[in-house]
């Protein structure tokens, strides 16, 4: 067992579900970057399993001080790479290395609500690595939550809404700018999003993905996804509230986008704001704020 009692850490405010801490927190062995990479290669399978069981794993003590160090550690785990260029993320981000990019370049006053990464698209990663290069003097924590726990509580507190989400799925709509908009949390241009240079190429990609679309007079592009699932079967008896419902309904707001038009059920019917508030309140209840320290690494299972 790699993660024995000597490796385990206690983090203030840590949650516990079914006798398992969330997140699991461990201390990596001390050493140089090469030794950290060797450690990562040795624990890759167990760390992935732990992230699935616990939801997330916080690792402290790795010798990571730069995006390049982070890239080296991530490469050592040898998980499949899911690059920013390959994604359909609507967030504007900066690539530092082929595997490392910023979480979001929106101004700090923009609220980014809890969500599963890229679940508003048909293409999404199974895991996410986060790294803290410099800890904030104040604030700066990253909230994460167990969506399997959220789903169980939503079914208890609002079964009709939970049933509708499960049966109908969701569709998302947003307007992509013709040029990058760094003032928005969703300011990635349609050219960057779809890796194209022309409208014709964008339309071909959209058609292949099953999207509908409408060009705006100013060159922006309004798109609507095909029906996407709101709930994911985790294959071990658990299900998770796997979507971007809360983030889209409450947070997809900028000069182009109105949250009220950002999401519907799969059949086109509107969501009841009161139902979304219940889901959001539960998410906040089960959320844990990662108290970053410089050099911390976190592995989050995007499905859980």
Question: Where are each of the predicted segments found?
Answer:
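A gly/proline- and charged-residue-enriched helix-loop-helix capping module
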Residues: 81-116
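Polymerase palm active-site segment centered on the conserved acidic dipeptide of motif C
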Residues: 80-91, 214, 291, 297
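Glycine-rich loop at the start of a catalytic domain that most often binds anionic cofactors/ligands
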Residues: 64-79
